[in-house]
């Protein structure tokens, strides 16, 4: 199956009561870990780059080619979409041109009418190239590449208007935030999600800020129409924790580890990369997308 646009497998998730994972990557090792997990679980997956991560990786073309080449060289058989996460208008257009198979245009920080106008333009350009489109209404809380939101509830009429632009799936604020959730977070507003899905029957909803939401809330949201769940912070924390532990062990056993040449970055980072894969596999289980490739 290899590289595909995402609209068909996201819609299949919506139609059949599970969700697919959108997992953010930051480099080669991160991408390998996500691909290994998806292949092991036989799950369709979106590998996502934020604007900042793509810049870190050398630009959108480099990031796109890295993911595509790894899919080929690793013999990946499950559907993989190369997705831009939270892209500004110009970034969305660039990703369409360099071969991303799915993009998110995030104009949620703009006035509603401008957000809708630009989303429609992005849809026209993307669909002409066979690229799927996600857009957002109701700012997701937290910060993502300079876009700051406090966790709004997406207005129902705005959500309906955004779907009418022709997008393929919708990110809608339901009290979710990016990054670690504070202890006083009140949880997802599932009543508002139900109102959204009743207004948009059968349409796939995207849950951003998937890291740190209790599993039972995620699964309840999936039952109500969420078909894609984004995960980033959870994998970052897993990688950092495993790498820190290895570094502490190295410090305590320096002579032995030096003799084994464990300073080699391929070895030094190995536990962290394994932790990413384990996190992705665990999320796939929670989302119910194992075996759905």
PLM features per residue range, with description:
Residues 225-256:
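A hydrophobic, small-residue-rich beta->alpha segment in the mid-to-C-terminal subdomain
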């Amino acid at each position: 199956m290899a590289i595909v646009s995402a609209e068909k497998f996201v819609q299949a998730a919506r139609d059949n009561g599970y969700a697919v994972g959108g997992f953010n990557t930051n480099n080669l090792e991160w991408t390998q870990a996500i691909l290994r997990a998806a292949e092991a679980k036989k799950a369709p997956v979106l590998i996502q780059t934020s604007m900042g991560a793509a810049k870190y990786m050398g630009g959108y073309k480099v990031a796109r080619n890295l993911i595509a080449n790894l899919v080929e060289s690793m013999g990946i058989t499950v559907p993989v979409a190369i997705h831009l996460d939270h892209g500004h208008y110009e970034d969305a257009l660039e990703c369409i041109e360099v071969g991303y198979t799915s993009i998110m245009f995030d104009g949620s920080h703009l006035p509603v009418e401008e957000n809708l106008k630009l989303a429609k333009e992005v849809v026209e350009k993307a669909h002409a190239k066979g690229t799927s489109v996600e857009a957002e209404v109701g700012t997701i809380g937290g910060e993502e590449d300079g876009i700051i939101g406090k966790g709004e509830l997406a207005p129902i009429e705005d959500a309906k208007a955004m779907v009418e632009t022709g997008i393929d799936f919708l990110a809608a604020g339901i009290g979710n935030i990016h990054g670690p959730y504070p202890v006083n977070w009140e949880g997802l507003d599932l009543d508002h999600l139900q109102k959204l899905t009743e207004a948009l029957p059968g349409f796939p909803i995207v849950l951003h800020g998937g890291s740190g939401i209790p599993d039972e809330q995620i699964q309840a949201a999936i039952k109500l129409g969420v078909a894609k769940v984004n995960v980033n912070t959870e994998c970052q924390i897993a990688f950092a924790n495993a790498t820190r532990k290895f570094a502490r062990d190295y410090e305590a056993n320096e002579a032995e580890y030096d003799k084994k040449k464990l300073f080699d970055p391929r070895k030094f980072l190995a536990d962290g990369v394994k932790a990413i894969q384990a996190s992705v596999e665990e999320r796939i289980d929670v989302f119910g997308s194992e075996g759905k490739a």
